[in-house]
């Protein structure tokens, strides 16, 4: 036998309980299994299967077991939910008599005393004695009772008195003699007190038939008179009750024996009695004896409980004992209620009295069964003797007795008279011709007309119009029986097609799937970004630079017609070709040059900005498609690190500003833009917004006088210009180094802020004629590094523009500094001196 993990026992009777493995269960085990009915499915060998009902809210299967013998897939509870079975009704309140009987009944454990002896079970009150059976052996079969009585009383002959033995002996020896009838009747049917008086009456042995009624009638009158004489002076109520009971029982038992027929007072029965008496006078002695014994047996058969002390064949003391038995039980019940604790002697005496009363009851039952056996044996012998001597008359006598016995019972007559085996149902005025079922009078179709049958029931299914199916069903296993047709329909409905079941299952899943609530975009919060995915992002185009808020009209000479990647600077860091940003000149070439932004242009943009600007990113879309890539972020960090050497760049600018006109070269022969670029000088106004020390910069009017406009001479070859620039820079290098050391100490105290911008200064509006890349050959240093337009250090324009003439500034200024400061914030640092976004391509 398979057992689970939790093996434990009951605290009451120490029997093993359910051994369900997942949790502790204190229910009783099923017979032959280690689990209760709730958890028996853990044992795979158990004849149960699991209910196939699946809950909709959690998609879990029911765990109730179903016997495999039942042809169903759902348990009773879910069949009730589905409407197949009717729901259970609440139990009605019990009747007052039943509740009273249940309250009086005491459990068996409460009947045990502390010393182990069992207290007598309390008897019901006198009001319930007539309702409850007092004798458990009253309706048992004869053979069973004989065995039980023999087991209880091994020596029954010892308990019988000597008088009873003499009576039994006289019955056994003289049962064939007709003359012994008065004596046997007097001894068997009358109480012992009256037997002596009845035997003292004169009896004529020559005429037994005439003497018998006189003796019986005389004994009857003498009995009543003797009872009146005996109890005349008694005033006890109990004695009067006993006298009435004795008279009633005596009249009931003696009159049938005297008349020789059943106890009825109808006219038909009296006529039958007269006919029988006349026939008995003309019959043979064997037939008379048979007739007498049959009457006696019939009288005993009509009394269902002939052995319960109502036969009066014993001493009168036994009747008193029977009366004391009831009073004893009531007394025991009263004592149990009044006295809870008694001594050992009292309990032992009560137990002995209980056993004595039980013994008397069993002896009385045994004597009654013995009398029944003797009477049946005598009747059989008389019947055999009469059949041998007078067979025709014996058969006629038996037939007459049978008719008399079956006359009061109409049911027995109908059953005995109709042996055709056909159905007795009447359909539309015609009798049914179908054969009846065994032991019934109806066929299968009309068996429901028999109200007394309990095996068949009507089909519980209903049609579409509400009418119930009337086909009989023999089904004792289901609570709602169905006929074959409706049972097949129910099976098809429960099983169904696989595709239909799967379809409904998916429909239920989709129906009960929780819907996502759409949140408004204004209430949606920015969630944390997930970690980097395994796939790398594609490189995206850089963010176009933000335009200044001032006048965006740029002069046409700042347009870049070609790629600016060829510009080199001595201070530009080494950048590979793939690290250069994409060309943005094509993107900004469509912007008109005379585009101006006013305050009204921002009236529609500013109200749309969120209140909390901490998490707001101007250059970030909904899907973050404009965020810079990791490569761009690393390049930006590297460029910012290279921009940390701005003091040296400023020192170079101040040193290059002291360079005069190039010797041996006529700068006026060059084009105007190149001459202005080479002869440019830094003045105090140029870097006024940087708040630098005035000692670092020379006054423009002393050291750098403006050159008057003159016709431009032809350009010098680029090679000569570059050579001259290199030689001049080499000659002035010691002086520049000295200036750089002085400027480091002075620029250490510069107030540089992150929020300042100098793009509105002279560098922002500087006119650069970039029509030809050969004009920038003079800016190329010996190291040959390139200067990109997108990402460059602020030192690049400082070193390159230090040689520009001052006259170029006067020609290129298109907007006053005061007008630009109205729209732009103060300059943050020197890092914004060189802004390539200011350069636009020429249309």
Curated annotation (Swiss-Prot):
Q: Where is the composition biased (Basic and acidic residues)?
A: 159-175
List compositional bias (Pro residues) regions by residue number. 705-717
Task: Respond yes or no to whether keyword Transcription is given for this record.
Answer: yes
Provide the protein's localization: Nucleus
Instruction: Give residue spans, biased composition: Basic residues.
Output: 503-540
The UniProt keywords, alphabetically, are: DNA damage, DNA recombination, DNA repair, Nucleus, Transcription, Transcription regulation
One of the Pfam families matching this protein, by short name: zf-C3Hc3H
Instruction: Specify whether Cell inner membrane is a keyword of the entry.
Output: no
* Polar residues: bias regions: 176-187, 197-216, 221-231
Segments of skewed composition (Low complexity): 796-821
Can you supply one Gene Ontology CC term for this chain's record?
nucleus
The entry's family comment says:
Belongs to the INO80D family.
Q: How does it assemble?
A: Component of the chromatin-remodeling INO80 complex.
Role this protein plays: Putative regulatory component of the chromatin remodeling INO80 complex which is involved in transcriptional regulation, DNA replication and probably DNA repair.
Name recorded for this polypeptide = INO80 complex subunit D-B
> Which organism does this record belong to?
Danio rerio
């Amino acid at each position: 036998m398979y057992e689970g993990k939790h093996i434990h026992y009951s605290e009451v009777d120490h029997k093993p309980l359910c051994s369900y493995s997942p949790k502790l269960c204190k229910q009783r085990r099923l017979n032959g299994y280690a689990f209760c009915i709730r958890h028996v499915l853990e044992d795979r060998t158990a004849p149960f299967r699991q209910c196939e009902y699946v809950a909709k809210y959690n998609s879990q299967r029911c765990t109730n077991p179903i016997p495999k013998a039942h042809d169903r897939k759902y348990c009773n509870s879910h069949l009730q939910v589905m409407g197949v079975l009717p729901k259970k009704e609440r139990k009605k309140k019990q009747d007052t008599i039943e509740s009273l009987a249940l309250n009086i009944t005491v459990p068996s454990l409460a009947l045990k005393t502390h010393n182990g002896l069992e207290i007598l079970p309390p008897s019901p009150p006198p009001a319930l004695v007539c309702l409850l059976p007092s004798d458990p052996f009253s309706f048992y079969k004869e053979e069973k009772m004989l065995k039980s009585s023999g087991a209880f009383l091994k020596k029954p002959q010892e308990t019988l008195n000597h008088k009873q033995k003499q009576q039994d002996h006289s019955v056994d020896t003289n049962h064939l003699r007709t003359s012994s009838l008065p004596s046997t009747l007097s001894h068997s049917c009358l109480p012992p007190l009256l037997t002596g008086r009845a035997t003292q009456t004169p009896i004529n042995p020559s005429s037994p038939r005439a003497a018998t009624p006189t003796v019986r009638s005389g004994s009857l009158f003498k009995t009543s008179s003797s009872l009146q004489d005996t109890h005349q002076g008694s005033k006890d109520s109990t004695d009067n009750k006993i006298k009435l009971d004795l008279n009633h029982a005596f009249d009931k038992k003696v009159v049938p024996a005297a008349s020789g027929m059943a106890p009825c007072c109808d006219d038909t029965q009296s006529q039958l009695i007269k006919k029988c008496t006349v026939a008995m006078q003309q019959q043979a002695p064997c037939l008379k004896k048979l007739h007498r014994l049959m009457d006696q047996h019939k009288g005993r058969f009509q009394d269902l409980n002939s052995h319960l002390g109502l036969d009066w064949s014993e001493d009168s003391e036994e009747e008193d004992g029977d009366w004391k038995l009831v009073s004893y039980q009531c007394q025991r019940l009263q004592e149990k209620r009044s006295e809870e604790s008694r001594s050992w002697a009292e309990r032992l005496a009560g137990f002995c009295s209980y056993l004595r009363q039980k013994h008397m009851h069993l002896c009385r039952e045994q004597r009654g069964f013995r009398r029944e056996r003797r009477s049946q044996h005598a009747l059989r012998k008389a019947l055999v003797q009469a059949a041998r001597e007078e067979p025709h008359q014996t058969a006629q006598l038996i037939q007459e007795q049978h008719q008399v016995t079956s006359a009061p019972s109409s049911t027995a007559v109908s059953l005995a008279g109709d042996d055709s085996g056909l159905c007795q149902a009447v359909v539309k005025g015609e009798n049914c011709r179908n054969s009846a079922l065994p032991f019934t009078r109806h066929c299968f179709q009309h068996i429901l007309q028999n109200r007394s049958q309990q095996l068949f029931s009507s089909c519980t299914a209903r049609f579409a119009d509400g009418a119930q199916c009337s086909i009989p069903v023999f089904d004792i296993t289901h609570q709602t029986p169905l006929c074959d047709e409706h049972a097949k329909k129910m099976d098809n409905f429960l099983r169904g097609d696989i595709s239909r079941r799967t379809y409904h299952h998916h429909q239920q899943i989709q129906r009960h799937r929780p819907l996502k609530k759409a949140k408004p975009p204004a209430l949606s919060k920015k969630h944390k970004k997930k970690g980097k995915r395994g796939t790398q992002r594609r490189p995206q185009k850089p963010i176009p630079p933000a335009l200044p808020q001032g006048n965006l009209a740029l002069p046409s000479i700042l347009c870049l017609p070609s790629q600016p990647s060829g510009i080199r600077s001595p201070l530009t860091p080494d950048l590979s070709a793939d690290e250069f940003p994409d060309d943005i000149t094509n993107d900004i070439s469509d912007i008109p040059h005379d585009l101006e932004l006013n305050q009204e242009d921002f009236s529609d943009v500013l109200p749309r900005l969120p209140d909390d600007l901490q998490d707001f990113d101007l250059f970030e879309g909904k899907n973050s498609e404009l965020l810079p890539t990791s490569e761009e972020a690393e390049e930006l960090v590297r460029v910012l690190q290279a921009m940390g050497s701005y003091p040296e760049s400023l020192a170079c600018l101040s040193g290059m500003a002291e360079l005069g006109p190039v010797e041996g070269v006529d700068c006026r022969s060059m084009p105007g833009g190149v001459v202005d670029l080479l002869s440019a000088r830094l003045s105090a106004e140029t870097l006024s917004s940087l708040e630098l020390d005035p000692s670092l910069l020379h006054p423009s009017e002393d050291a750098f006088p403006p050159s008057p406009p003159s016709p431009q001479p032809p350009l010098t070859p680029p090679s000569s210009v570059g050579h001259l620039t290199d030689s001049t820079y080499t000659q002035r290098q010691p002086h520049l180094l000295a200036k750089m050391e002085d400027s480091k100490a002075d620029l250490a105290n510069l107030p540089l802020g992150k929020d300042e911008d100098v793009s509105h200064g002279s560098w922002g509006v500087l006119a650069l004629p970039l029509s030809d890349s050969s004009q920038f050959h003079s800016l190329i240093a010996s190291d040959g590094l390139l200067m990109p337009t997108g990402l460059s250090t602020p030192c690049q324009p400082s070193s390159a523009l230090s040689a520009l003439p001052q006259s170029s500034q006067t020609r290129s200024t298109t907007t006053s500094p005061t007008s630009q400061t109205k729209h732009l914030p103060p300059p943050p640092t020197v890092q914004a001196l060189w802004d390539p976004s200011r350069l636009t391509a020429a249309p």
